[in-house]
Amino acid sequence: MNQVYNFSSGPAMLPVEVLRRAEQELCNWHGIGTSIMEISHRGKEFIAVAKEAENDLRDLLSVPENYKVLFCHGGARGQFAAIPMNLLGDKVKADYIDGGYWAACAVKEAKKYCTPNVINIKTEINGLKSVKPMREWSLSDDAAYVHYCPNETIDGIAIHEQPDFSDNKIIIADYSSSILSGPLDVSRYGMIYAGAQKNIGPAGITLVIVREDLLGKARKETPSIFDYAVLAENDSMFNTPPTFAWYLSGLVFKWLKEQGGVQEMAKRNRAKAELLYDVIDKSDFYRNQVAPENRSLMNVPFQMVDASLDSKFLAEADAQGLQALKGHRVSGGMRASIYNAMSIEGVQALVDFMADFERRNG
C-alpha cells in the first residue's frame, strides 16, 4: 500500500508512533491481560494513566499551579454552553469576538444563557480576508469575560497575537485547532479549552484549563457534568470518562515531549505552512484568500482559478494517497489541515502533486 497522508480537519491524523504503541498494547495493556478500554477508571492503573497525562500536558504548556486541568465530555460545542453557565457569575453580558464560523457558533449557543456583546473583527486587506488586531477590539467595561477563537479552521484565519489586556479582563479562548502547535502563555487566560480531535488525540474528550479562582461560580441549573468545580473536585471523574481517548491523548503528550515539545512543533509547523503557502503564492493557478499576517499554520484553504477542476483535483489527489483535501461545505475549494502529526514529507508530497496537476491542467 502506498503512503497515505491524511489532511482531514478533524478527526485528524495521529502520530504513527502513537498508533503503533496503542496497537501493541490494545489487548494486553502493560501485561495485565486486558485492554486499557476494559479497566475501571477508578482503579489504580487508570488513575496513574490519567495523572501522567495531566502532568505531561502541564510540562508541555508550562501550566501554572493555580490552574486546573480538566478532561471533559461534550466537545468544544459543549463548552460553548458550559462557559456562560460557569463563568457569567452575577453579570448578564459577555464579550464575544467574531472572527469566523466557530466564533459565531459560540455566540449562537451563548445567547441561551447570556447577552453576548458581539464584536465583529472581520475585515479585508487588499481584498484578502483578515481580522483586526487586538488593540482595535472594542471591549465592554461590564462584560463577565472575553471569548475568542484564535484559529478558524474553515477560512484558515488565525489570530497570532497573545492577549495583553488589563488584569481584570477574563480571557477565554477556543484553542481546539491550534493547542500544542507552539508555545502558549497560559497565564494570560482565564480559561483555555480544546476539542481533542485535531492536535490532542481522538474525538471524544475535551481539554479545559481553567484558573482556580474562576471555579465555584456556576449557575445553580448547570448540569453537574458541566460544572467545572464538580469536575475539579472529582479529578474529571464525576462520571465515567472517555478512558480510551484519555489514554491515547496521554500517548500523544509523550510523543510531543519526545519530539522536543511545543517549541519544536512551532518550528515544524511554520516550515510546513511556508512550504505550502509558497507554492500557492507563486502560482497563477491556485490562490489563497487570507492576508499573510492572518494565515493559519494549521489549516490552509486554497482554491483553483478554474473551480470546475476541483473534483478532478480531489479524485487524483486521493488516488495518490493525499486524502481529505475537500474544503468545508461553507467555503468550498480545497483545504489542507497540517496539524502536529502531519510530517514535512506529507506536505512535500502535496505540493509536488499540486505542481504536477498545474502543469497538466494549467
Swiss-Prot record:
Binding site residues for L-glutamate: 9, 42
A molecular function GO annotation: O-phospho-L-serine:2-oxoglutarate aminotransferase activity
Amino-acid positions noted as binding pyridoxal 5'-phosphate in the UniProt annotation, renumbered to this chain: 76-77, 102, 153, 174, 197, 239-240
Main location: cytoplasm
Gene3D superfamilies according to UniProt: Aspartate Aminotransferase, domain 1, Type I PLP-dependent aspartate aminotransferase-like (Major domain)
Catalytic activity field: O-phospho-L-serine + 2-oxoglutarate = 3-phosphooxypyruvate + L-glutamate; 4-(phosphooxy)-L-threonine + 2-oxoglutarate = (R)-3-hydroxy-2-oxo-4-phosphooxybutanoate + L-glutamate
InterPro entries according to UniProt: Aminotrans_V_dom (IPR000192), Aminotrans_V_PyrdxlP_BS (IPR020578), Pser_aminoTfrase (IPR022278), PyrdxlP-dep_Trfase (IPR015424), PyrdxlP-dep_Trfase_major (IPR015421), PyrdxlP-dep_Trfase_small (IPR015422)
Transmembrane spans: none
Cofactors named for this entry: pyridoxal 5'-phosphate
Pathway(s): Amino-acid biosynthesis; L-serine biosynthesis; L-serine from 3-phospho-D-glycerate: step 2/3; Cofactor biosynthesis; pyridoxine 5'-phosphate biosynthesis; pyridoxine 5'-phosphate from D-erythrose 4-phosphate: step 3/5
Family the UniProt entry places it in: Belongs to the class-V pyridoxal-phosphate-dependent aminotransferase family. SerC subfamily.
Quaternary structure, from the entry: Homodimer.
NCBIfam families: PRK05355.1 (NF003764), serC_1 (TIGR01364)
Name of the protein this chain belongs to: Phosphoserine aminotransferase
